[in-house]
From Swiss-Prot:
Organism (species): Pseudomonas aeruginosa (strain ATCC 15692 / DSM 22644 / CIP 104116 / JCM 14847 / LMG 12228 / 1C / PRS 101 / PAO1)
The family this protein is said to belong to: Belongs to the methyltransferase superfamily. RNA methyltransferase RsmG family.
Swiss-Prot/TrEMBL keywords: Cytoplasm, Methyltransferase, rRNA processing, S-adenosyl-L-methionine, Transferase
Protein's recorded name: Ribosomal RNA small subunit methyltransferase G
Disulfide-bonded cysteines: none
Lineage, uppermost ranks: Bacteria, Pseudomonadati, Pseudomonadota, Gammaproteobacteria, Pseudomonadales
Length: 214
């Protein structure tokens, strides 16, 4: 019996609808195939502390989809500390026309992400095994996103060299990070803050959008 059932498909479809994210049959199939890989590989690779497939739908898939409206601009995106691929893999599935780079320093996690790329045939997805400080792309990214990666201060400092004046930094957080905002480097500013309602997720979710000031 597959770990991914019609129940999970229904939960994904219902949650995406609540978020206002349009999922055609192919995108839903790819997201569920990704979920199946995450469940399978998590047993050996410890990709996420979430073990229950029901929780994975809400806390990983729907949480990733909650930022889709804020990631529509820009063609070249970086997911820093991608881990098990959230939100980078769902964004690559939702936006096949965009280029998504998934960066992580953990070899087990990048091996998993490479397998996801191959099995789901995600031609727009690139996996990079590197520490963020050592990563030197050819050009700045249009958007840089992180989910439970670091403090806002570290996120800004460690990725400063990866973006420019037009880049948007998207930081996915739980409770509103008031103390972290107080430590934000002077050359960064908060462009927008959004409280996110993720179907099936308990607790607060916030998205902070940052830009460089210099």
């Amino acid at each position: 019996m597959s770990a991914v059932t019609q129940h999970h498909a229904d939960e994904l479809a219902r949650g995406a609808d609540e978020l206002g994210v349009a999922l055609d049959a192919d995108k839903q199939r790819q997201l569920l195939a990704y979920l199946a890989l995450l469940i399978k590989w998590n047993k050996a690779y410890n990709l996420t502390a979430v073990r229950d497939p029901d929780e994975m739908v809400s806390r990983h898939l729907l949480d990733s989809l909650s930022i889709v409206p804020y990631a529509e601009a820009g063609d070249n995106w970086l997911d820093v500390g991608s881990g098990g691929g959230m939100p980078g893999v769902p964004l690559a599935i939702l936006f096949p026309e965009k280029r998504l780079t998934l960066l992580d320093s953990n070899g087990k996690k990048t091996r998993f992400l490479t397998q996801v790329k191959l099995e789901l045939k995600l031609a727009n997805l690139e996996v990079v095994h590197s520490r963020v400080e050592a990563f030197r792309p050819e050009s700045p990214f249009d958007g840089i996103v992180s989910r439970a990666f670091s403090s806002l201060e570290d996120f800004a400092n460690w990725t400063r060299h990866l973006g420019g004046q037009e880049t948007r930094w998207l930081a996915m957080k739980g409770v509103h990070p008031n103390e972290e905002l107080a430590a934000l480097p002077e050359d960064f500013r908060v462009e927008a803050e959004h409280a996110l309602a993720v179907p099936g997720c308990q607790g607060q979710r916030h998205l902070l959008i940052l830009r460089r000031t210099a």
